[in-house]
């Protein structure tokens, strides 16, 4: 049994140059854990609260208050306590905060400590994090990556409405081969855009952000890049979208500014269905606004038996909200973001609940990331079938892919890449 000896919080910078919380935890057996918390650009209104200082410092985005909470209230409560029971520790943190959305201490403060304790406890047991978090008796599995190679919406300063255009290299036997495929397509897309005289600057998540006339133009460019790289769109490489519809939703309608069009929920479901019919799209995230549950029902009835429909802003990694969606037959997949809910235990609970309901889980980064690679371990530990962690450039994104390569090597012959099984059986 290892007890918590010391907890320290600090303010560090994320990949967008904004402050975030990092925590260090030492146990009395000498084990050490460190974790840094990411931050989103398009956020769900029901996410756990990320505590920011306001004022002029760092344009109001400082996290000194959250760090102070780590170094006082949280440290005093945890010091001397056991690190062996993650669920009990996280419950203590939740109770210590006492609010329904962690707005007293800050989800960024709570999560940094929750993750750092998990890291320290893993080292205390002599295990990598994915083994420490893994359910007893379950086999490790490498997830299929959703690679965001073209950005629009809130993740880029361009005219494309859909926030993320992703490739999923599913037709491969090993994660390392899937990663190579993604990297080659990324470089092919850069050439395609350069030849058209378009920008090859990248957005927050490392994807290109060209000024294209429509969402279909973005899809066509990606299809061309897949073919130029020598791969088959659909068979080897599928497409996925993050529509981030909450950013498009105003006055009860969905607005595509780049195309000068707007739709009601049924019309927008039709628009997305047309894209699915025309392109090898196997997954759509946030296809409707987070508050438009009737629209989600329409979309699920229209496309839920055909493709994966992922709830991000809809579910915000919250088991209670997910249960409502399951009960109402809305979506068939959940995006998993640690900082949306604020503790390791609640995140694991959301994945377990999704799995029991037949929903897939997609473990995800945020647009404001750090060098922390814990989500790679989380995806492997929970057998989440997919991971979404950006493009094939920017160290904050590539760090997660590199961690998955290390895990694959460590697992050796036991390293199973999920490939086409990433999607529900009825989707192939």
From Swiss-Prot:
Its EC number is 4.2.1.11. It is an enzyme of class 4 (lyase). It comes from the Bacteria. Mg(2+) binds at residues 242, 285, 312. SUPFAM superfamilies: Enolase C-terminal domain-like, Enolase N-terminal domain-like. (2R)-2-phosphoglycerate binds at residues 163, 337, 366-367, 388. It is found in: Cytoplasm; Secreted; Cell surface. The active site is at 205 (proton donor), 337 (proton acceptor). Its main location: cytoplasm. GO terms for biological process: glycolytic process. InterPro entries: Enolase (IPR000941), Enolase-like_C_sf (IPR036849), Enolase-like_N (IPR029017), Enolase_C (IPR020810), Enolase_CS (IPR020809), Enolase_N (IPR020811). Pfam families: Enolase_C, Enolase_N. Keywords: Cytoplasm, Glycolysis, Lyase, Magnesium, Metal-binding, Secreted. GO terms for molecular function: magnesium ion binding; phosphopyruvate hydratase activity. GO terms for cellular component: cell surface; extracellular region; phosphopyruvate hydratase complex. Its cofactor is Mg(2+). Pathway: Carbohydrate degradation; glycolysis; pyruvate from D-glyceraldehyde 3-phosphate: step 4/5. It catalyses: (2R)-2-phosphoglycerate = phosphoenolpyruvate + H2O. Binds a second Mg(2+) ion via substrate during catalysis. Component of the RNA degradosome, a multiprotein complex involved in RNA processing and mRNA degradation. NCBIfam families: eno. PANTHER family: ENOLASE. Belongs to the enolase family. Catalyzes the reversible conversion of 2-phosphoglycerate (2-PG) into phosphoenolpyruvate (PEP). It is essential for the degradation of carbohydrates via glycolysis. This is Enolase. It comes from Halorhodospira halophila (strain DSM 244 / SL1).
